Amino acid sequence: MIILEKEAHSSQFSLDGVFITHAHIGHYSGLIFFGREVMGSKRIPLYLMPEMENFIRSNGPWSQLVKLRNVEIKQLKVNKSIELSNVAITPFLVPHRDEFSETVGFSIRGPNRKAIFIPDINKWSEWDQSLIEVVKDSNYVLIDATFYKDGELPGRDMSKIPHPFVTESMSLLSKLPYRERGKVWFIHMNHTNPLLNVDSEESKFVKNKGFNIARRGDRFIL
């Protein structure tokens, strides 16, 4: 929120809505700050897929946000665009650990450019779309970089928490021209991921291969 306040100060801008991808801890738990104990917000539009909506309505303390009208739920439908000013946002399903809700990514189309946002997904081979073709058809592709490589979590079976390793994503996209690889931005890094360190050898390797590593404060012009 500090970064957001710096980039879009609340004296000039208001929060016009929040889109949620799925019901995993890092993607919805911040909603609680809209509640009476903190912001006490008024009817902030909350864009949710059907299963995600059911999760919010059926479980406290999130259900209280609806009851007290801190948020106002707007239901999303898969592959159906929502028009917001000059931006169209379209949710699409991606395979993930859907214990509590479906999981979506978002296509975000502005007047001149299109961004793809996929913070969480299982292995790319499980998706019914070609990541290579998605990159070719987009201007910015922000993808899951939770873990850099296998073995990053000592003592854990990483197949139980599936994500595409950064090394796997780079290998999959390695045959793209250098310019096309520059559309790809790695996001959603776990605290164990060496890409968080801008000076790490892994960060330098990724950049040398033509890919980008998202940092706080980055802007994407649509």
Question: Which ranges hold each PLM region?
Answer:
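Short, glycine/charged-enriched secondary-structure capping and boundary segments
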Residues: 6-9, 32-36, 60-62, 104-105, ...
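Structural beta-sheet core signal
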Residues: 18, 46-48, 116-117, 186
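Divalent metal-coordination and catalytic microenvironments
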Residues: 22, 46, 89, 106, ...
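A short, active-site helix/loop in glycosyltransferases that binds the activated sugar's phosphate group
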Residues: 51-61
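Core dinuclear metal-dependent hydrolase active-site scaffold
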Residues: 1-7, 73-134, 218-222
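A short helix-to-beta-strand connector/capping loop
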Residues: 42, 66-72, 85-87, 207-210
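Cap/insert and terminal regions of metallo-dependent hydrolase folds
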Residues: 114, 122-219
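Active-site metal-binding motif and surrounding structural segment of the metallo-beta-lactamase
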Residues: 1-47, 139
